[in-house]
Amino acid sequence: AANEGNAVGIAAGYYFSTNRVPLVYMQNSGMGNAFNPIVSLADKNVYSVPLVLLIGWRGEPGTNDWPQHRTQGAVTDKLLEMLDIPFAAAEDNDDLMEARIQWAVRLARTRRGPVAVIAGKGVFAGGKKTSVLSGRYPMSREEAIEIILDTLPEHTIYVATTGRATRELYFLRERRKEGHGHDFLNVGAMGHASS
């Protein structure tokens, strides 16, 4: 999906065609993108789509996170409450997490609307990370950014999206002893840098 709102729309289509409860995973910074189709499509007062939202909780109160996540983190649970979306915390024990997802699926079916499970910092950090992309691409993101810097005219304005691309552009400029005057390092608004 292009963004979280698209994911909710795709999930609704999945439900309409299979009668199975879909799960949409998103970071809480994507909740704003998801809310329009949640309240105007999936809501129990519209098309009653039982939907499980698994939401990564960046900026959770009491945790140390980047500034762009703090406000969203502080209001994540409040936004779900305002939209009358029941929610519970994710568990970092596999058996408990399976039970939590089963709870969410049952409740989504019963209430015929969205239910959320919020995953705080570190909940999914216990296992070994594996890359599904390892070896598929001959060039790293940093190498691609450096080629772009080498190729485009000196006064080109660069807009870098949130996350690693922003950091890599910043540190490449530092390493190359170049200024940042033509760089917009977008640390928030995930998925909207090209707008």
Predicted segment positions?
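Thiamine diphosphate
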Residues: 1-194
